[in-house]
C-alpha cells in the first residue's frame, strides 16, 4: 500500500500516540461480545477481525463471545419451526435447541473463526460444552399472562444462565497464539445443552478470568441521558441512579446489568460500544474519547 508523505506521517503519528495504551494493556485479557451490525456488514466484519488479530499481535489477549439470534430465527423459519417468545426470550424445546447448536456452534462460530484466520490470526471456535467449561443451569422466567393476578415462573426449555466458568480451560489460550471464539452454549451436569444470552456469557467469562475490559458491541451510540446525549463515562453508582430514575430502561437493561455485574466483580471497566463505527474496539482501547460508554467504579474526572 502506497502512502503520500503526509499520509505516512499521519499513520506514524497515530502509531506513536498509541504506544502508552499498548504498554498499558499488553498481557491483559479483553472479553469482547461481538454482535449487531458489526456481525452483518461485510466491511465491519473484516475490520473487526483485523482488530482482533492486531490485539493479539501486540500482546493483548482477546476472547470473543458472539450471539446469533437473527441467524437462529432465519434457520428455524427455513425448517418451518415456529418460534414462540415469552418476555422477549425464545421458548427452546429440544428440536429448537438442536437448531440453536447447529447455527451458533457451527455456522456463525465458524464464520467468525474464518474471518479472523483470513486476517492472519489463529482463531479456534468453541462452545461452553467443550471441556464443559461453561456450566449452565436452567433459567425460569416470571410471566404474568392476561387475567392472572400474579406472575408465575415459566419453564422456557433449553434456556439457561451461567452457573460457573472453568478458567483453567481459557488460560490455555491465553498462553498460546490462539484466539478463542465462544458460542454461548452451556451444559449442565447431566449433559443437557442450554442457549445462554451472549452478553451474559461475555460478562461471566470476563468476571471469571479477571479481564481488564468487557466490551459489548451494540447498534447504539452508547448509554444516553434523557436528552439523547451519549454519556461517555459513568461510575457504577451513576448507572444505578440512571436505572432508578428511568433513564436506562427496556432493552438496554440486560446489557447494563451484565456490565455492572462484571465491574462489581473486579473487571476494571465495561464498555457499551457502537459497533456500527469501523474499528470501534481499537478506538475504545487506544483513544481517550472512545465510541461509546465506559462504566467503572471510578467517577468521571477522578
Swiss-Prot record:
One of its GO terms (molecular function) is acetylglutamate kinase activity. Pathway: Amino-acid biosynthesis; L-arginine biosynthesis; N(2)-acetyl-L-ornithine from L-glutamate: step 2/4. Substrate binds at residues 68-69, 90, 195. Pfam families: AA_kinase. It is found in: Cytoplasm. It catalyses: N-acetyl-L-glutamate + ATP = N-acetyl-L-glutamyl 5-phosphate + ADP. Gene3D superfamilies: Acetylglutamate kinase-like. Its EC number is 2.7.2.8. Belongs to the acetylglutamate kinase family. ArgB subfamily. This is Acetylglutamate kinase.
